C-alpha cells in the first residue's frame, strides 16, 4: 500500500512514521508513506495556500489550486493506481472499524489535512472521494485525524501485526468490545485472575470470553448491539442481565 499525506505541517508525522508498528511496517515494505507540504504547489512567490471567503465571514479558507495540484502530483507518481482521496473534516462520515477495513483493501490512499476555517467547496465537490471525521469535536487541523486513520488501517495490512489473530479479535473487529485480558501473576496483591482462565479448558474459556465481551458491550456501548446478529445463547445472557437490573 502507498499512503500520501498532504499537509502544511509535514514534520508532525515524523513521530508516527518513525516509531512502533508503523515504523516496522514501513521497514518491512508493507506500506510506503510519503508526506508532502502542499504549500510547495501554491502559485506565486509567497506560496500562499489560504484566502478570505467570498461573501465575508470569519477565518480563512484553503485555496483549491495548491491542493488540486498536489493531489495531481502524487497521482502521477502512482499512475497504475486509482487512489482514494480522503479529506479529513469534522463534517465527514464518522470513522469506524468497518471503514478502516475498507481502506485497508486499497492500493493507494491520499489524505488531505486542512487548517484554518475550512476548504474551498470545490475541493469537496470535484477532488475527494471520501470525507472522514474522527468525532464530533474540532481540532486545529486534520493531521491528528489522519494519523488515527492511518494507524488503524496499517495494522490491518497482511504481515504488519506479529500475531495474525490480533487484528481480528480487537474491539470492534467482531462488532463487540473486546473481553478482559489478564497476564501473570495469577494473584497480584489479592486481585486474582478468574479461575476459568487457569482451567485449561479451551471451550469454557472461549465461552467466558464471548460472554464477557457481550457484557462489556452491553454495559458500555449498548448502541453496538442494535444491529448485531446475536446467537440464542447471547440473547439469553442479555435477558439475564436486563432482568437483574
Swiss-Prot record:
Keyword vocabulary terms for this entry: Cytoplasm, Methyltransferase, S-adenosyl-L-methionine, Transferase, tRNA processing
EC number(s) per entry: 2.1.1.228
SUPFAM superfamilies: alpha/beta knot
One annotated GO biological process: tRNA N1-guanine methylation
Cellular component, GO, one term: cytosol
Cellular location(s): Cytoplasm
Pfam families (UniProt xref): tRNA_m1G_MT
Residues annotated for S-adenosyl-L-methionine binding in this entry: 114, 134-139
GO molecular function ontology, one term from the record: tRNA (guanine(37)-N1)-methyltransferase activity
EC top class named in words: transferase
Superkingdom to which the source organism belongs: Bacteria
Cited InterPro entries: Alpha/beta_knot_MTases (IPR029028), tRNA_m1G_MeTrfase_C_sf (IPR023148), tRNA_m1G_MeTrfase_TrmD (IPR002649), tRNA_m1G_MTases_N (IPR029026), tRNA_MeTrfase_TRMD/TRM10 (IPR016009)
Main subcellular location of this protein, as a coarse class: cytoplasm
Record's keyword annotation contains Nucleotidyltransferase: no
Reactions the enzyme catalyzes: guanosine(37) in tRNA + S-adenosyl-L-methionine = N(1)-methylguanosine(37) in tRNA + S-adenosyl-L-homocysteine + H(+)
PANTHER family: TRNA (GUANINE-N(1)-)-METHYLTRANSFERASE
Annotated family: Belongs to the RNA methyltransferase TrmD family.
Subunit structure: Homodimer.
Function in brief: Specifically methylates guanosine-37 in various tRNAs.
Designated name of the protein: tRNA (guanine-N(1)-)-methyltransferase
Gene that this sequence comes from: trmD
Amino acid at each position: 500500500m502507498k499512503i500520501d499525506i498532504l499537509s502544511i505541517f509535514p514534520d508532525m508525522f515524523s513521530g508516527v512514521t518513525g516509531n512502533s508498528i508503523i515504523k516496522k511496517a514501513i521497514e518491512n515494505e508493507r506500506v510506503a508513506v510519503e508526506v508532502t507540504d502542499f504549500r510547495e504547489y501554491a502559485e506565486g512567490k509567497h506560496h500562499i495556500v489560504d484566502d478570505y471567503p467570498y461573501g465575508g465571514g470569519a477565518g480563512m479558507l484553503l485555496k483549491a489550486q495548491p491542493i488540486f495540484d498536489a493531489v495531481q502530483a502524487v497521482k502521477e507518481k502512482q499512475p497504475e493506481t486509482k487512489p482514494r482521496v480522503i479529506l479529513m473534516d469534522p463534517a465527514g462520515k464518522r470513522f469506524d472499524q468497518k471503514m478502516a477495513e475498507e481502506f485497508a483493501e486499497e492500493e493507494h490512499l491520499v489524505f488531505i489535512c486542512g487548517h484554518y476555517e475550512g476548504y474551498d467547496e470545490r475541493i469537496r465537490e470535484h477532488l475527494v472521494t471520501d470525507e472522514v471525521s474522527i468525532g464530533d469535536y474540532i481540532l486545529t487541523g486534520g493531521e491528528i485525524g489522519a494519523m488515527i486513520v492511518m494507524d488503524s488501517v496499517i495494522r490491518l495490512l497482511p504481515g504488519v501485526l506479529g500475531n495474525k489473530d490480533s487484528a481480528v479479535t480487537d474491539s470492534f473487529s467482531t462488532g463487540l468490545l473486546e473481553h478482559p485480558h489478564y497476564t501473570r501473576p495469577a494473584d497480584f496483591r489479592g486481585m486474582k485472575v478468574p479461575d476459568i482462565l487457569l482451567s485449561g479448558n479451551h471451550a469454557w474459556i472461549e465461552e467466558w470470553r464471548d460472554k464477557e465481551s457481550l457484557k462489556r458491550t452491553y454495559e458500555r456501548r449498548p448502541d453496538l448491539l442494535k444491529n448485531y446478529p446475536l446467537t440464542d445463547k447471547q440473547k439469553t445472557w442479555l435477558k439475564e442481565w436486563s432482568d437483574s437490573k
